[in-house]
Amino acid sequence: MSELESEYRLEYFETEGFHRKQCPVTDVYFWTRDPDRETCGEPPADDYSFIDNPGFDDQYSLSGMREEFLSFFESRDHDRIEPYPVAANRWRDDVLLTQASIYDFQPLVTSGQTPPPANPLCISQPCIRMQDIDNVGKTGRHTMAFEMMAHHAFNTREDASDEYAYTGEVYWKDETVRLCDAFFEHMGADLTEITYIEDPWVGGGNAGPAFEVLYRGAELATLVFMSMEQDESGEYEMKDGNRYSPMDTYVVDTGYGLERWAWVSQGTPTVYEAVYPDTIEFLKNDADVTHTTDEKELIQQAAMLSGYLDIDEIDNLASARADVADELDVDPSVLTDLLEPLESIYAIADHYRTLAYMFGDEIVPSNVGTGYLTRMVLRRTQRLIDDIGIDAPLDELVDMQAERLGYENRDTIRDIVRTEDRKYRETLSRGRRRVETLADEYADRNESIPVDELIELYDSHGIQPDMVTEIASDRGATVEIPDDFYSLVADRHTDDDTTETIEKRRDRLADLPETDRLYYDDQTGTEFEAVVLDIFEQDTGYDIVLDQTMFYPEGGGQPADHGTLTTEEETIEITDVKAQDGVILHQATENPGKGDFIRGQLDVERRRRLMQHHTATHIIGHAARKVLGDHVRQAGAQKGTDSARFDLTHYERINRIEAKTIESVANDIIRQNISVRQDWPDRHEAENEHGFDLYQGGIPPGQNIRTITIGDDIQACGGTHVTRTGDIGTIKILTTEPVQDGVERIVFAAGDAAIDAVQTTEDALYDAADVLDVTPEHVPETADRFFTEWKERGKTIDKLKSELAEARAQGVTADAVSIDGIDAVIKTVNGDADELRKTANAIVDEDAVAVLGSDVDGSAQFVVGVPEDIGINAGDVVGQLARKVGGGGGGPPDFAQGGGPDAASLEVALDDATSVLRSMHET
């Protein structure tokens, strides 16, 4: 930290008469205007002093505070921009949820690859931080959903400006702190009470100096100066133990928590009363949570000390709460009983808002990604509601928040919540027995349920780990969920074919120019000429680099083109095409020779079918959104020559009527013969005009992105497409199926592949008609009739088997042997395993032990049945008999079965059954 001391000595601090001090409680360094101040202003050094003592001239609602902030910075030459969705994976592939305003501009803008939408700019960005979920309700200040008000400036060092998408310095540390001070002053704050705590920032391979801005005990702003990158020989060592060096771009990254500013302006006991006043009162009334005047006073006093509580920073919540109780001179159990119902209500209110943001941005619950996080919040909310006894339907409560946030898809939101509530109840009922069995097993061993079991429960049964924790705790078992749990699950399903060879070639590839992609200039072209720039020898052949190519490399769910490269001497087959760092690698078994001139020829039929299926995928996605709703998002896609699949987010199974409607809408688009247009707009202009639905198939790099427009559907896409929708011919949906909970799959075929698929189905229909000796149109009713008759015959057979078993039992009990006064029937029965079981049950009903054997398809089979209170274990008997025929078996004490391959020893084994029974009864 001392290495950065010079970074914090600002000219602004010197001009304004600030003093640098070290807090005796927290040991941090901070800056203050007050020469007599000793502590840094952050709990536990200082308590909340704004509660019942608002910190600003006026009290503000969320909307009022948001407008005050944005207007202030607009008047100081900042452009106001619209907030991004809370689902950051709409424009980024490295994170799921938006956790800060800077997420909107990472990595492309912060790295200088693309310019920002404005510079400088201000924004109020909705965010969700899942890591705060355990703190919500308990600390009085944490909210999982929040808005980060911010102003940003993007700068480059003068000597490197030509290399980046923005140039020069807009403003840096002094101006950032001056603007922060000015906003506090604008709000009527006492500037002498503000402290700027030195707190270096590190994250994602970058770092820089930063200030936490405290006012009356509350952290109201963070000012980060992102200016360094990780470097082994760097000048600065940061708090993560790594060294860093200055980088060419440097970014002002500020964050002013909207909710906390509104809280300090109102002086309420917790942030929740400031953010959710109506919701809190509604929930308290519904749950019948009331307080006396003295209890309200105690709650307010505890709130002023709640800054001590932070689940991430304290070892034990109970001990921290005991410290608060001791400070208030009250019994800890009294304080806990008073606060816990309120904490649940606070958490429920916060979770409603979080869910409204998630559903409003059309995240669909599932078992992966943002869908899993949404489901986790929803189910945690459901459990809190059940525990505290709130009667109001969950869908209505979420809808109230969605209405306040201005979302228009409220009918879909309510439908999703109702569906999820039903699934939650079913999952709890279905999975509880399996978890209870595991919990008992590991509780007896005094061990935690291991990670492998958690993964299996999740993978095979869909039981979330937090649900396992809840059920297991009731059985005295513990669960430790690893931070990388979902990575471990993903590893089970990831077949990583990437070889080290490509990594080793990276330096060599870096010296090659990017391959000119001719297929973007002419998507119908199938022949071209090129020069061989380099050749990489592989174990299975060669990777050929050309200066330009018509071959499309595998990517975006579209397989690579195939074809040939022809030199003056030979023709070489191209069997695969890959892209790495802008260079396209053509895989072949022959070496054409570096520097050779070649002619390329695509497999025309393969390219045509792939183009048809790629354009058809866009059309299917558009049709699905029209039919199922705007919440539908692409969750994956794969195009082929014979068929394609489109995975989409949806909270219910796609039924046959919906599938037919999607197919009809898609084919109507084909019949309209709409132009399929390719454009290269500026990224920010495209995002502003079309939103982040652009990125259904992934997030492309670069300032200009390639878009494909089909009617009113537009998507960023790098694949090859037909010229007009009519070129597809037709689309036929083959199947719909669930991929996982919350993700549905549509498998379809387009063009000639669709005709092939229909003909294959027709062949199957005609074959079935021939077997049934009817015409094709009568196959369904005939099959239904045959199936009904087959079921009836099965019932008749079962009935006859039961009657036969009863008759056999009556006949054989006369031949029963007596073993110490117990009747036992030991006999060979001609019949299958089902007949053995039925006969054994009938004998047991006659109060006799049944030991039956049969030769079933060349193998010996045994069934043993034992009446109650006989003292013989059927499983042990079967085990001994089965070993005599080279096999095994077992079961519960009253009924067991088994067998082995040595049918010739069946009678010998049955001859020994009497002695086996006698020895067991004697013991």
UniProtKB/Swiss-Prot annotation:
GO cellular component, one term: cytoplasm
Localisation: Cytoplasm
The entry's keywords: Aminoacyl-tRNA synthetase, ATP-binding, Cytoplasm, Ligase, Metal-binding, Nucleotide-binding, Protein biosynthesis, RNA-binding, tRNA-binding, Zinc
GO BP, sorted A to Z: alanyl-tRNA aminoacylation
Superkingdom of origin: Archaea
Catalytic activity field: tRNA(Ala) + L-alanine + ATP = L-alanyl-tRNA(Ala) + AMP + diphosphate
Gene Ontology MF: a single term: aminoacyl-tRNA deacylase activity
Enzyme Commission no: 6.1.1.7
Pfam families linked: DHHA1, tRNA-synt_2c, tRNA_SAD
Binding site for Zn(2+): H614, H618, C717, H721
PROSITE patterns from the UniProt entry: AA_TRNA_LIGASE_II_ALA
Named cofactor requirement(s): Zn(2+)
Main subcellular location of this protein, as a coarse class: cytoplasm
Ranges where the record places region Disordered: 884-903
Cofactor, free-text remark: Binds 1 zinc ion per subunit.
Record's compositionally biased regions (Gly residues): 885-901
Summary of the function given for this chain in its UniProt record: Catalyzes the attachment of alanine to tRNA(Ala) in a two-step reaction: alanine is first activated by ATP to form Ala-AMP and then transferred to the acceptor end of tRNA(Ala). Also edits incorrectly charged Ser-tRNA(Ala) and Gly-tRNA(Ala) via its editing domain.
Domains as described in the record: Consists of three domains; the N-terminal catalytic domain, the editing domain and the C-terminal C-Ala domain. The editing domain removes incorrectly charged amino acids, while the C-Ala domain, along with tRNA(Ala), serves as a bridge to cooperatively bring together the editing and aminoacylation centers thus stimulating deacylation of misacylated tRNAs.
Protein family (similarity comment): Belongs to the class-II aminoacyl-tRNA synthetase family.
Protein name: Alanine--tRNA ligase
Gene: alaS
